[in-house]
Amino acid sequence: MFPMVTEFMNYGQQTVRAARYIGQGFMITLSHANRLPVTIQYPYEKLITSERFRGRIHFEFDKCIACEVCVRVCPIDLPVVDWKLETDIRKKRLLNYSIDFGICIFCGNCVEYCPTNCLSMTEEYELSTYDRHELNYNQIALGRLPMSVIDDYTIRTIFNLPEIKT
């Protein structure tokens, strides 16, 4: 008869332990109920990007001296720089500059090492297209000023996200 009593005691202890575990999980679930949702309705709401965000590269044609430092520091040798040597003035003249954003890894080395600061990162991150060949930007497309999210009146910008507490 004693083994039956000990089995009931073990069963009771296991039941209490299971109820405690379920209660702990339920309390964690309830603690998340008072937090704000993290979901952002993307096309209508956008986050303000940070100051050091690595978006589309902006290129200023007039500042470039065709030194090709950007090509040397790029881990995938991506920027294509075409230039012609002007023998009378002994300087390089830039003819064409292009970057294929379908291949670019947005590491920012070209921007960081450019001696004339003709390259800069923008806050523009919407680069999706239906054809991958449209992602090959020449100097005209790279020179286009980025559209600021803050200036667009049709989009509600979200400045502060609720911090996720762990």
Swiss-Prot record:
Cofactor or coenzyme needed = [4Fe-4S] cluster
UniProt-listed Pfam families: Fer4
Task: Show the catalytic activity.
Answer: a plastoquinone + NADH + (n+1) H(+)(in) = a plastoquinol + NAD(+) + n H(+)(out); a plastoquinone + NADPH + (n+1) H(+)(in) = a plastoquinol + NADP(+) + n H(+)(out)
- Cell inner membrane: is it a keyword of this entry? no
User: Which E.C. number(s) belong to this protein?
Assistant: 7.1.1.-
Question: Which PROSITE patterns has this protein been placed in?
Answer: 4FE4S_FER_1 (PS00198), 4FE4S_FER_2 (PS51379)
Matches recorded under InterPro entries: 4Fe4S_Fe-S-bd, 4Fe4S_Fe_S_CS, NADH_quinone_OxRdtase_chainI, NDHI
Q: Where is the 4Fe-4S ferredoxin-type domain?
A: 55-84, 95-124
Listed binding positions for [4Fe-4S] cluster 1 are C64, C67, C70, C114
**Cell compartment(s), UniProt:** Plastid, Chloroplast thylakoid membrane
The note on the cofactor says: Binds 2 [4Fe-4S] clusters per subunit.
Q: Which GO terms describe its cellular component?
A: chloroplast thylakoid membrane
Q: List, in alphabetical order, the GO biological process terms annotated in this UniProt record.
A: photosynthesis, light reaction
| Chief localisation class | plastid
Family statement drawn from the similarity comment of this UniProt entry: Belongs to the complex I 23 kDa subunit family.
PANTHER family documented for this protein: NAD(P)H-QUINONE OXIDOREDUCTASE SUBUNIT I, CHLOROPLASTIC
Q: Which NCBIfam families match?
A: ndhI, NuoI, PRK05888.1-3
What is said about its interaction partners and assembly? NDH is composed of at least 16 different subunits, 5 of which are encoded in the nucleus.
Q: What is this protein called?
A: NAD(P)H-quinone oxidoreductase subunit I, chloroplastic
Give the classification, highest ranks: Eukaryota, Viridiplantae, Streptophyta, Embryophyta, Tracheophyta
